[in-house]
């Protein structure tokens, strides 16, 4: 599996980036994770089709090429960061590349709740008609007190959180396979479906 792992912040130092970097190493035998930084994207504005920034087009292409997307979000004032909202607005307004794309949400925060409100906010956004991502149900990875969650080598310290992450990622790989199969079968059915006017003799 090939996943695009989006760092949902423009902060230079981020435990959400550390979380994705850890996942990239830890799950390398199961999947390839490409980290993507949204900090270089321009703030969203309504652009004409021929004026969409190249950075946005590049992000859309990477999303399309990936089997699924992982988004790591911090929590600012009970919500996702403005820079992540802006990136999603670009996708919604232009390519809609997240439509039917399997998505896993994870998050780290300095507080005890581990970005739970931001993750709920992000789910609501990704479920909007213009994005319409395929969100893995009943799954949250909440890494609270994240400043103390990693050792100097960037390894996750808490064995219980590591086991939880292992289980969630295993389920996400299976979820990705299921969605890919479902969409493939739906495409075949659409191709094979004939309407009355198509079968009517001339």
Curated annotation (Swiss-Prot):
- State one Pfam family annotation: FMN_red
How is the co-factor bound, per the entry?
Answer: Binds 1 FMN non-covalently per subunit.
- Write the record's keywords in alphabetical order, separated by commas: Electron transport, Flavoprotein, FMN, NAD, Transport
Q: Cite a single GO MF annotation.
A: azobenzene reductase activity
InterPro entries associated with the record:
Flavoprotein-like_sf, FMN_Rdtase-like_dom, NAD(P)H-dep_reductase
- GO CC annotation: cytosol
Its cofactor is: FMN
Taxonomy, superkingdom: Bacteria
- Show the domain comment: CrdA is formed by a single NADH:flavin domain, which is homologous to the analogous N-terminal domain of CrdB (51% identity, 65% similarity).
What assembly does the database describe for this protein?
NADH:(hydroxy)cinnamate reductase Crd is a heterodimer composed of CrdA and CrdB subunits, encoded by adjacent genes.
| Family stated for the protein in its record | Belongs to the NADH-dependent flavin reductase family.
Q: What does this protein do?
A: Component of the NADH:(hydroxy)cinnamate reductase. CrdA is probably reduced by NADH and then transfers the electrons to the catalytic center of CrdB. Is likely involved in protecting V.ruber from (hydroxy)cinnamate poisoning.
PANTHER family registered for this protein in UniProt: CHROMATE REDUCTASE, NAD(P)H-DEPENDENT FMN REDUCTASE LOT6
Give the protein's recorded name: NADH:(hydroxy)cinnamate reductase subunit CrdA
């Amino acid at each position: 599996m090939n996943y695009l792992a989006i760092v949902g912040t423009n902060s230079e130092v981020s435990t959400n980036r550390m979380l994705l970097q850890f996942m990239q190493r830890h799950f390398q035998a199961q999947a390839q994770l490409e980290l993507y930084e949204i900090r270089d994207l321009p703030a969203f504005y309504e652009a004409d089709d021929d004026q969409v920034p190249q950075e946005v087009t590049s992000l859309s292409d990477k999303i399309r090429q990936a089997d699924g997307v992982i988004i790591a979000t911090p929590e600012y004032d009970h919500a996702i960061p403005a820079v992540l909202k802006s990136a999603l607005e670009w996708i919604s307004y232009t390519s809609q590349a997240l439509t039917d794309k399997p998505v896993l949400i994870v998050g780290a925060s300095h507080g005890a709740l581990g970005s739970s409100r931001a993750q709920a906010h992000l789910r609501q956004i990704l479920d909007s008609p213009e994005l319409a991502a395929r969100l893995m149900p009943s799954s949250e990875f909440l890494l609270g007190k994240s400043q103390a969650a990693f050792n100097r080598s960037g390894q996750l310290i808490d064995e219980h959180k590591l086991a939880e992450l292992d289980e969630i990622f295993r389920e996400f790989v299976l979820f990705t396979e299921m969605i890919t199969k479902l969409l493939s079968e739906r495409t075949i059915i659409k191709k094979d479906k004939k309407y009355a006017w198509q079968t009517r003799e001339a």
